[in-house]
Amino acid sequence: MEPEVRNNPQESRYELIVESEVVGVAEYRREGDTLVFPHTQIKSSFRGQGMGARLVQAALDDVRAGGGRVVPRCWYVAEFIDANPSYRDLLAA
């Protein structure tokens, strides 16, 4: 089954779902149109499979679609943006 990423605004996080199980989260705090990402986590049995990148990419794509900006406090989100320059325009000034 293909992993799915969904925004769960009640929990202030994006969730990576595999076979109905939450296997990863990218937590955020909303500050107006900006989302601050302080923490990202992938279940240990799913690490090393590109799941973190899928989660962060989908979260950033969703922020872009909504016209928002991001502050990457989480090292993984910061490194993802650094490695993928097409997302640098999302960085809040």
Feature map (PLM): residue ranges:
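Conserved beta-strand in the GNAT
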Residues: 21-29, 36
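Conserved acetyl-CoA-binding loop-helix of GNAT-fold acetyltransferases
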Residues: 48-59
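Structural motif
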Residues: 8-10, 31
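C-terminal structural segments of small proteins and small subunits
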Residues: 61-93
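Conserved beta-hairpin
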Residues: 13-23
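General beta-strand recognition
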Residues: 15, 34-36
